[in-house]
From Swiss-Prot:
Binds 2 [4Fe-4S] clusters per subunit. Belongs to the 4Fe4S bacterial-type ferredoxin family. RnfC subfamily. The lineage of its organism: Bacteria, Pseudomonadati, Pseudomonadota, Gammaproteobacteria, Pasteurellales. [4Fe-4S] cluster 1 binds at residues 378, 381, 384, 427. [4Fe-4S] cluster 2 binds at residues 388, 417, 420, 423. It is a peripheral membrane protein. Its EC number is 7.-.-.-. HAMAP family: RsxC_RnfC. The keyword Nucleus does not apply. This is Ion-translocating oxidoreductase complex subunit C. PANTHER family: ION-TRANSLOCATING OXIDOREDUCTASE COMPLEX SUBUNIT C. Residues 554-564, 587-600 have a biased composition (Polar residues). Residues 368-398, 408-437 form the 4Fe-4S ferredoxin-type domain. Residues 465-565, 583-624 are annotated as: Disordered. The gene is rnfC.
């Protein structure tokens, strides 16, 4: 850190590698003073306008709000609040088109102005030194201030993280990108307030040196800042050569100190903190005037805009309304850019609102804009590498991005790319390198975010498993303690431990089983040891007697049911014989004889069946005997009918 200060105090300027000198085109907008646009009727305030997380809503649909009233609140310094740009009614809270080249929607508050522009109650102060550094940081946070130089990183978080490390505080007034002049005009017209904001920040951080760096193409701004200092030596002014991108953080630090910020680290790691001049003005307004960040200076430029210049624009104002108020000549063949020509983003929808990020709206005509030429193959001319101010190898990163070799992209320090656009500007093959690098960064971020969520889920799962195991162990311990308490209670009341008694019974049972399974032996007359089968033979005999007894019971049951059925069968057979005999005596004709013989045959069959039934009565079960008797009765009945018919015929 001492090396940083010694190099800075030498007064020397170092030149960084690469860089370009594109046409500045700043005279279009820097000749007119700051102006205000008419107050609009509808404002669209995105819930997140900074690099961080979205705040929590404080309002709902239908609420009436005042100018400067907080619409969201945060839980930390990286969750900045947003504020009402004017007084009016909340019409809706829903997705609305974002100020982004994707044209996607984002959660947005729709505020309809009442035209009164009535402020919320404010508490301005004259002397900021009456507040502690912590109180000042809190006021900066409550005002929703983010870096207005393009990064939109929460200012309070940046200050707090570097509070004990800063030796050199750099205020960036370089404004190196073509067309943009908002910082230039702000320094010319509000130099006193900018100096006041710088002194507030110096009071918080206590750096050893404070410097304002301004490019040499802004002589009016340099003069205004020096006049505002009035000879004070607590803040110095350092004029740097005009070169793009000298306003980038790492490049400006190298210009002033000759020291490079290590890859992957912040400038605070070498004792340097940098802030934009617009951010210093916002800090002064927040601390002294108690005004949140609800407006900023925006450059309106390009040949398609009639009233070029720099305007105070309320955050949330639709871009289409701003352009209309500035005399924009709509032409579908020419896009609108948010930002400058090098790092700006093409807007697909002009209904998108102005946010804290927007410092310029560029509307070029055919003299300033041409359709992108067809992309050609890389010829490896090294023009991009020679011009890169970060010492990267854009052609190699291009191949890695095309092949989605994310590991190689990271190895070649893609994260250090500041997206200045120089590589694409100098490429003779018209390769849109910045688009490839932005897409590759987004893919790597998605992969890491997915891995981060996976790791977090794994940690949560393992924590849950550990908790469940701990709870199970605690449950078992409670059960064991309760069981022990019950045993002790029973032991006190009955005089013995029930568990021990149960174990003793179990041991005794096992011992008996062991004895019963031992093989008994006896000694023969010859002295041989033979197995003693006495018990086994007794068991077999008992089983045999049990089977015989069961069979005898079944036989007795059958005999009790058979006599009745057999007697009925004998009676039926006797009746049948009597009828057949009578029929034989009565019939003298051959037909009668024949029928008599038939009847006798039937009788014989019946008799035989009955005799067979009688013989087998002991072998058949009662059910079969009954069936046989029924069949015999049916045959006898049929025979009787035949006899009656013959007698009638003889008469």
């Amino acid at each position: 850190m001492a090396d940083v200060l010694s190099r800075f105090n030498s007064g020397k300027l170092w030149d960084f590698k690469g860089g370009i000198h594109p046409p500045e085109m700043k005279s279009q907008s820097n000749s007119q003073p700051l102006r205000h646009l008419p107050l609009g009727t509808d404002f669209y305030i995105p819930l997140k306008q900074h690099l961080g997380t979205t705040g929590n809503l404080l309002i709902k649909e239908g609420d009436y709000v005042l100018k400067g009233q907080a619409l969201t609140k945060g839980d930390g310094l990286r969750m900045l609040p947003v504020h009402a740009p004017t007084s009016g009614t909340i019409k809706s809270i829903k997705p609305y088109v974002a100020t982004h080249p994707s044209g996607l929607d984002e959660p947005t508050i729709h505020l309809q102005s009442d035209g009164l522009d009535q402020w919320i109650e404010r508490n301005p102060i004259d002397d900021f030194s009456t507040l502690s550094p912590e109180q000042l940081i809190h006021k900066i946070y409550q005002a929703g201030i983010a870096g207005l130089g393009g990064a939109v990183f929460p200012t309070a978080a940046k200050i707090q993280s570097a509070e004990q490390k800063v030796k050199l505080l750099i205020i960036n007034g370089a404004e190196c990108e073509p067309y943009i002049t908002c910082d230039d005009r702000l320094m010319r017209e509000r130099a006193d307030e900018i100096i006041k904001g710088i002194r507030i920040l110096r009071y918080i951080l206590h750096p050893e040196k404070v410097v304002i760096a301004i490019e040499d193409n802004k002589p009016e701004a340099i003069s205004a800042i020096r006049n505002a200092l009035q000879g004070a030596n607590d803040i110095s002014v350092r004029v740097i050569p005009t070169k793009y991108p000298s306003g980038a953080t790492k490049q400006l630090i190298y210009l002033l100190t000759g020291i490079e910020v290590p890859s992957g680290e912040r400038s605070s790691s070498i004792g340097v903190l940098m802030q934009n001049v617009g951010t210093m003005f916002a800090i002064k307004r927040a601390v002294i005037n108690d005004e949140p960040l609800i407006e900023r200076v925006v450059t309106l430029t390009g040949n398609k805009i009639a009233e070029k210049g720099n305007y105070w624009v309320r955050l949330g104002t639709p871009i289409s309304q701003i352009l209309s108020d500035a005399g924009y000549q709509f032409d579908k063949h020419f896009p609108i850019f948010a930002g400058g020509p090098m790092m700006g983003l093409e807007l697909p929808n002009l209904n998108a609102p102005v946010t804290k990020l927007v410092n310029c709206l560029l509307a070029p005509d055919y003299l300033e804009y041409a359709e992108p030429e067809a992309e050609q193959a890389c010829i490896r001319c090294s023009s991009c590498s020679d011009a890169c101010p970060v010492n990267l190898m854009p052609q190699q990163l291009y191949w890695f991005a095309r092949s989605e070799d994310h590991k190689k992209s990271e190895e070649y320090a893609l994260k250090d790319c500041i997206e200045c656009g120089i590589c694409a500007y100098v490429c003779p093959s018209h390769i849109p390198l910045i688009q490839y690098f932005r897409q590759e960064k987004a893919k790597i971020w998605q992969i890491k975010e997915k891995q981060k969520k996976s790791d977090e889920a794994k940690i949560r799962f393992e924590a849950k498993q550990a908790r469940m195991e701990r709870e199970e162990q605690e449950r078992k311990a409670r059960s064991q303690r309760a069981a022990q308490a019950r045993r002790e209670e029973l032991a006190q009341t009955k005089g013995e431990d029930p568990v021990k008694a149960a174990l003793e019974r179990l041991k005794a049972k096992k011992a008996n089983e062991t004895e019963s399974t031992q093989i008994k032996t006896l000694t023969s007359e010859k002295g041989e040891v033979l197995p003693d089968n006495t018990d086994l033979m007794a068991q077999r005999k008992a089983r045999r007697l049990a089977r015989q007894q069961a069979a005898s019971q079944v036989e007795n049951q059958e005999q009790q049911t058979q006599p009745t059925d057999a007697k009925k069968a004998v009676v039926a057979a006797a009746i049948a014989r009597a009828k057949a005999k009578k029929l034989a005596q009565a019939n003298s004709t051959s037909e009668a004889i024949s029928n008599s013989q038939t009847a006798e045959n039937e009788v014989e069959k019946t008799k035989s069946a009955v005799e067979k039934t009688q013989e087998n009565s002991t072998a058949l079960d009662p059910k079969k005997a009954a069936v046989a008797a029924a069949i015999a009765r049916a045959k006898a009945k049929k025979l009787a009918k035949t006899q009656t018919t013959l007698e009638n015929n003889q008469e």
